[in-house]
Amino acid sequence: MNHMPAVRRFQAGDAPAATAIIRGLPDYFTDDVPAKVEHDAASHQAWVLTDSGTVAGFAVAATKSPSGAEILWIAIDATRRGRGHGTRLLSHVLNHLAADGISVVEAKTLDRSSGYRPYEATRAFWERNGFIHIDTIDPLPGWPPGNPAAIYVAAIRHSGSASGVLAVGPHWLA
């Protein structure tokens, strides 16, 4: 039976699965990240993507102002990458944020000036999903030295339709 991936709210019992996803992506996360994700998931809005009943990804978003939010974490299990799961999860998160009145979303990732190749796909993911690179901060407070942060933003809005379809990116501003 083919099960469609589903997104639901992160629950306390999902922390071990999130940790396993993080540990399975050693090129992307440092050893202190599982504790940070667990803390952030308990303190902010968080979701998991399940595939055939198994947690295959997670996302955490923090509301920064009445109209702004930041995607703090998003990750998909290494064995399930490239199947559209990240886009599905991000779309769900952005739709939820837009329905809550958020109009600008920020994401941070490792900047291309770092020369670290694994993050090329990460930056491409944000750009493919309507995010625009607006700045590089080095050093970013809280990040290890030598890890320039690429700051990405996207303008979002809820369509107002019953389906809640989201408009992302600069094209809807015209």
Predicted regions: what they are:
Residues 74-82, 110-113:
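A short, internal acetyl-CoA/4′-phosphopantetheine-binding micro-motif in the GNAT/acyltransferase core
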Residues 139, 146-148:
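Class I S-adenosyl-L-methionine
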Residues 66-68, 104, 149:
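A generic structural signal for beta-strand entry/edge sites
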Residues 97-118:
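Conserved GNAT acetyl-CoA-binding A-motif
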Residues 5, 9-73, 77-79, 90-92, ...:
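Acetyl-CoA-dependent GNAT
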Residues 87, 111-135, 144-145:
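Conserved active-site alpha-helix within GNAT-family acetyltransferase domains
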